[in-house]
């Protein structure tokens, strides 16, 4: 599943790198430029050889700026988000972002011949919160539906969720985070995430 997500995420991210300020529908923006960037990823020898520094550079520069990590973290935390102090919310957002980047950067080296099928956008033209639907087609394997929950803020579209085969990426963490908060409080969750990320809890 991680491989399919990476193919879709990179396709999604590519559009925003080129057209961050264009007045385009989010699905049209993705479709227009994603294939070019996916081809770049496919042919990058450093990525194909598993160069983790290069992989994370791509993730951080082309993907991360196009996601609303604060909202993603709030969704993953559920009601516990409101119990966190502003400083705790900041730490949680930072650690969750790092976790996602680390988790999915490893699958980037597995990208080969996947293609992306972009579905028509079914949303009110004036809506600021839409779902962009795509399907990752993999040779010899069943296609995987990957949808992006996106919100327009200050004229810019950003994603706040990725739904793979009907399963939300961020809310999939909710039970795990809830258990950790019950066991060790919000600071305990922060410490656990920091340990996983190798950054240590300060």
Language-model segments: what does each one mean?
Residues 102-144, 196-202:
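Surface-exposed, charged secondary-structure patches
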